[in-house]
Amino acid sequence: DCIPNPSPKEITERAVGFVMTLREKHPDTPIIIIQTLIRETGNFNQKARENVKQQNEAIAEQVEVLRKKGVKNLYFIKEDRFLGTDHEGTIDGTHPNDLGFDRMLKKYKPAISKILKIKFRDE
């Protein structure tokens, strides 16, 4: 989990170097960066909510740095209530359950299908 586990500061310090290393070893491989999930726990823990907000802002800023450096084949998916808004998408307020993963798939699939130029069996 390269976005939810490090601090915003660590994301700022490490993301560009990580992507540049990956790009050096795999120059043509698409790199997809996805912001971290907005978690239910943030409804009750303002510190956690603010941390997720800062993590997502930090990775968005680093994606812009990478784009300005001319990194090609780099894609960014912004958090879009991936788990839904009915409080049913996690097992514990943090980790997705089956419903949460299904919702994430439905949000990610169109972008991934377009980026990788693939069709999923159910399309």
What are these regions (language model features)?
Residues 1-123:
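Alpha-helical cap/lid subdomain in secreted, periplasmic
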